[in-house]
């Protein structure tokens, strides 16, 4: 097995997000490599819940309206571009925000989820507030896992090298906005 990557198919009319094991020369954006495939799945699940990015393999917009909306639409985790329920411009704005999030910029998401949680609780919609709280905790958990100690908030690629007389090892770390996002 090889290390997992997050693939966002930005070359498609309605991009998808998925876990892949290798990078290809295509129009997709890749994040990684990551050491834990479970972490990648958690990040993908969280991204789909927050930004409602599709996970189906339908060829859009060619197949728009040919099928019923999937279960993810009914669970509120997809905006059903397969049915034309969201415009391509709105969908691309969600993808742009998700790419920002995947790049390590968590603050706007934390603020948005906090605001929605408080608004839902003021409307006495405690189930919705609890779901926003859970999403908020997931984002904070990912944020904490990716903290590094650097006073500079620059983007860096760090290469570490160690050897002894028989072996050598090289490790590459990707730092974005002062956070370790991959290695």
Please give the residue ranges for each predicted region:
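Acidic, glycine-enriched active-site microenvironments
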Residues: 1-183
